[in-house]
């Protein structure tokens, strides 16, 4: 059945069929400019549990002005391996060829993430399929596990990509965010892993998706699911910004000057809270159509403390710091420190400075979870695909289209004003 999303209204795309049965989780969103097409991905599960994931599903949306007309739900059976469940959709669009790569993991049977971490025995495979017609048809699955991870797999208790979107950098590099539970050592007498900790990293390709590699782990902080966005300061240097989930009640942020091979300035952002155990969040960069006054409070007491830095890249980052950015960041995430509720949209007008996030504009009041953003820069539009409900966050995955002006009108340029109440920004 076709549905239409109008600007500024939430439109459910995937609905839970029963509170103990078929459930859709883990949204990923991609926009393809030449065809004005949204691709909305999700996991179909037999229950809400991770180990009961089945396969990925897709709905294609055609944008007509500020309307999106959605086609029917399509199961992506191409994105499967025999005896495995498919999880964590992570799409990226390659502009030169027009090819869409859909990354995901395939996990053996019903083996849980916890079982893999405790035993140190990985049950996940790194895979992708691709489409050359904006998601109408898809290739056969390709397993990249040996090519990308190879002998290092013995140190990866388990791993995953995304979830959410990947990006293509100005250099042409394709970047897929990922994380692994890394095993630094083993108790040989018991054949059990020792001090296993999760760290984010990037998987990338410099030849339009023909071959793939992985970058260095983001250390020393524990980081899990992440997304990245490329920002450009006035000095003209592109910098890759990473936003990662942590269990530390605050979001982790890091910067890369080598296109994602390594990250520096890993820090906790006190302005971006995490609920207990954390939650996935989404980030996109964009060039603003209009520029109000910029954030002034870069010396806030909430400015993050630098945990790690690289001398070789410090000079470039220092050159960019303190200058207005050509790129802004938009970030989506639950806004409560206590539970996954009230999905917020945050704006950062100076991404290379500390503590310059706005107060959130509440896009959905009530239970919420994972989300994914897409920026339509030339049109001044944004899309958000997010988990939400009235009693539980897994009741549906909804889509919202909103404008650049709408963001500014709700946030009113606020960055750090302590007297502002997030309830002022709630949207019906």
UniProtKB/Swiss-Prot annotation:
GO terms for cellular component: caveola; cytoplasm; early endosome membrane; lysosomal membrane; lysosome; membrane; plasma membrane; recycling endosome membrane. Keywords: Carbohydrate metabolism, Cell membrane, Endosome, Glycosidase, Hydrolase, Lipid degradation, Lipid metabolism, Lipoprotein, Lysosome, Membrane, Phosphoprotein, Repeat. Highly expressed in skeletal muscle, testis, adrenal gland and thymus, followed by pancreas, liver, heart and thymus. Weakly expressed in kidney, placenta, brain and lung. Changing residue 340 to A: Loss of enzyme activity. It is found in: Cell membrane; Membrane, Caveola; Early endosome membrane; Recycling endosome membrane. Changing residue 162 to A: Markedly decreases enzyme activity. Residues 294-318 are annotated as: Disordered. It comes from the Eukaryota. Exo-alpha-sialidase that catalyzes the hydrolytic cleavage of the terminal sialic acid (N-acetylneuraminic acid, Neu5Ac) of a glycan moiety in the catabolism of glycolipids, glycoproteins and oligosacharides. Displays high catalytic efficiency for gangliosides including alpha-(2->3)-sialylated GD1a and GM3 and alpha-(2->8)-sialylated GD3. Plays a role in the regulation of transmembrane signaling through the modulation of ganglioside content of the lipid bilayer and by direct interaction with signaling receptors, such as EGFR. Interacts with CAV1; this interaction enhances NEU3 sialidase activity within caveola. Interacts with EGFR; this interaction mediates desialylation of EGFR and enhances downstream signaling. This is Sialidase-3. It comes from Homo sapiens.
């Amino acid at each position: 059945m076709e549905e239409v999303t109008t600007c500024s209204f939430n439109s459910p795309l995937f609905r839970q069929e029963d509170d103990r049965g078929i459930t859709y989780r883990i949204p990923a969103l991609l926009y393809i400019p030449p065809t004005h097409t949204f691709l909305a991905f999700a996991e179909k599960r037999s229950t809400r549990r991770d180990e009961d994931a089945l396969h990925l599903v897709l709905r294609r949306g055609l944008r007509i002005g500020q309307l999106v007309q959605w086609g029917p739900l399509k199961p992506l059976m191409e994105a499967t391996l025999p005896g495995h469940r498919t999880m964590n959709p992570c799409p990226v669009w390659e502009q030169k060829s027009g090819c869409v790569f859909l990354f995901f993991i395939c996990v053996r049977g019903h083996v849980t993430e916890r079982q893999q971490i405790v035993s140190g025995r990985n049950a996940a495979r790194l895979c992708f399929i691709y489409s050359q017609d904006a998601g109408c048809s898809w290739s056969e699955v390709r397993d990249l596990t040996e090519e990308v991870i190879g002998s290092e797999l013995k140190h990866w208790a388990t791993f995953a990509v995304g979830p959410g979107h990947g990006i293509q950098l100005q250099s042409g590099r394709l970047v897929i965010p990922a994380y692994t539970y890394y095993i630094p050592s083993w108790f040989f007498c018991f054949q059990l892993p020792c001090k296993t900790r999760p760290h984010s990293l990037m998987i990338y390709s410099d030849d339009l998706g023909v071959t793939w590699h992985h970058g260095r782990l983001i250390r020393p902080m524990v980081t899990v699911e992440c997304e990245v966005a490329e920002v450009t300061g006035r000095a003209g240097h592109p910098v890759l910004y990473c936003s990662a989930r942590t269990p530390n009640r605050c979001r982790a942020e890091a910067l890369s000057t080598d296109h994602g091979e390594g990250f520096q300035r890993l820090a906790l952002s006190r302005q971006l809270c995490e609920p207990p155990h954390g939650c996935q969040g989404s980030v996109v960069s964009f060039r603003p159509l209009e520029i109000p006054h910029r954030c002034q409070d870069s010396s806030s007491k909430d400015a993050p403390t630098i945990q790690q830095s690289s001398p070789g890249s410090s000079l470039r980052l220092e050159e960019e710091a303190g200058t207005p950015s050509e790129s802004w960041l938009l970030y989506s995430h639950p806004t409560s420190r206590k539970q996954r509720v009230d999905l917020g949209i945050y704006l950062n007008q100076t991404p290379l400075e500390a503590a310059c996030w706005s107060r959130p504009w509440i896009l959905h009041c009530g239970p919420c979870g994972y989300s994914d953003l897409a920026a339509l820069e030339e049109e001044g539009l944004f899309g958000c695909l997010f988990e939400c409900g009235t009693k539980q966050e897994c009741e549906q995955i909804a889509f919202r289209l909103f404008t650049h002006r709408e963001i500014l009108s709700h946030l009113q340029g606020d960055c750090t004003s302590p007297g502002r109440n997030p309830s002022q920004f709630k949207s019906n």
